[in-house]
Amino acid sequence: QYYNGLGYPTVSVATTGGGGQTACSLTAYDALGREESLYLPVPTGSTLDYVSPSSIISSAAGFYGDEYAYSRNHHDALDRVTSVELPGAEWRSADRRNCTSYSANTDNEVLHYEAHVGTNSLVKPKDTSFEYYPAGTLAKVTSTDADGKTAECFTDMLGNTILQRVRMTTGNLDTYFVYDEIGQLRFVLSPTYQKNGKKAISAYEYRYDYRGRVVKKILPGCEYIQYWYDKADKLICMQDGMMREQGLYRFTVYDCLGRVAIQGLCSDCDRK
């Protein structure tokens, strides 16, 4: 990896899988130090020596037979990427690109689920103080790929992902993430949950101890997985449904430096 005078990585040289050949790629920056262009890798011989950007640019056009052998980023005034022009003359001539827009949620757009510390219940939107998140309370990022397929991501003021939505012609595929009051992820509700409302077969559940460690994980349609930790918060024992039927545990023993020393199965673990 080679860097420019400002410490930005520009030229990357790596060994490929066959015959010790190397490939080189280039990252170009604009006047504000933002990533502007990323050139596709080109073969450069069998050494890891530095290759000038101008050589990479000319080699890329010749190797791929395309003057647009690179992707190009466009930014807004806040330095966020708003669109990416994809490599290839055919993509460029058709103005096919990946686009990203930034906004906020509107009324009746995102359902409001709740989970509370000390309970294992999922509180559905109709049972909360407000069924939908009020307008403007969530950040919304909309991504549209070159084929016109759209996905949306909603996050709260703490940066927690609340909803990932994939737009479909027949409806939306919504995955909700539910947190408790102290920011612990408690439930992940898959798109099928929005149809059947059955937590046991369509939701992921995580339970924590008083130190914020996951002690039980419940996956859709599976027996729960249980975890035990030592005083240093290292995982020492776990048991899934199949192990439970056989009376087994998977254990881990660490050395004095906290490195994994022994792992195995046992029928009687000291889970304290």
Segment roles from a protein language model:
Residues 1-272:
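Beta-strand elements of repeat-based all-beta scaffolds
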